[in-house]
Amino acid sequence: MVARHFSFFLALLILYDLIPSNQGVEINPTIIKQVRKLRMRCLNQTGASVDVIDKSVKNRILPTDPEIKCFLYCMFDMFGLIDSQNIMHLEALLEVLPEEIHKTINGLVSSCGTQKGKDGCDTAYETVKCYIAVNGKFIWEEIIVLLG
């Protein structure tokens, strides 16, 4: 279960293809392969555009495309961070993330919890939108860069 949550954390970074080879981040190649496979599965399943994702990261704007919303849901679902009732469980990442960012994660969980939407895709999107509103700097500069 811990590996599954850690893989999700990596998935966010890999999702945006932002891990530079010179960053010094050592990631198990097996995990990268697994995450990329799940990323492709979610891209194929939802029809989300890699170009739209890349542009959103570059411009720090969360796209409102239904496919992107469902892509977020798919990734959260694949890594066990959203349950069958569409409740987010970001706090599960505390098991695998460095202690120095626990306070930030707890702040996001406390401030946002689960932002209910009309369905799972919309719930994932609204919750991520809240995370960005509460601590966009952390989401865009720390999470996305680490996972990229």
From Swiss-Prot:
UniProt keyword annotation of Coiled coil present: no
UniProt-listed InterPro entries: PBP/GOBP, PBP_GOBP_sf
Species the sequence originates in: Drosophila melanogaster (Fruit fly)
Tissue expression from the record: Expressed in the antenna, mostly on the anterior surface of the third antennal segment. Expressed in auxiliary cells and the third antennal segment and exported to the sensillar lymph (at protein level).
Location(s) in or outside the cell: Secreted
Keyword list, A-Z: Disulfide bond, Secreted, Signal
Segment forming the signal sequence: 1-23
Its job: Odorant-binding protein required for olfactory behavior and activity of pheromone-sensitive neurons in response to the male-specific pheromone cis-vaccenyl acetate (cVA). Modulates social responsivity differently in males and females, regulating male aggression and female receptivity respectively.
Gene Ontology molecular function: any one: odorant binding
Protein name (database record): General odorant-binding protein 69a
GO BP terms, alphabetized: courtship behavior; olfactory behavior; response to pheromone; sensory perception of chemical stimulus; sensory perception of smell
Induction: Expression is inversely regulated in male and female in response to the male-specific pheromone cis-vaccenyl acetate (cVA) and is dependent on the active neurotransmission of cVA-sensitive neurons to second order olfactory neurons.
Family label: Belongs to the PBP/GOBP family.
One Gene Ontology term, aspect cellular component: extracellular space
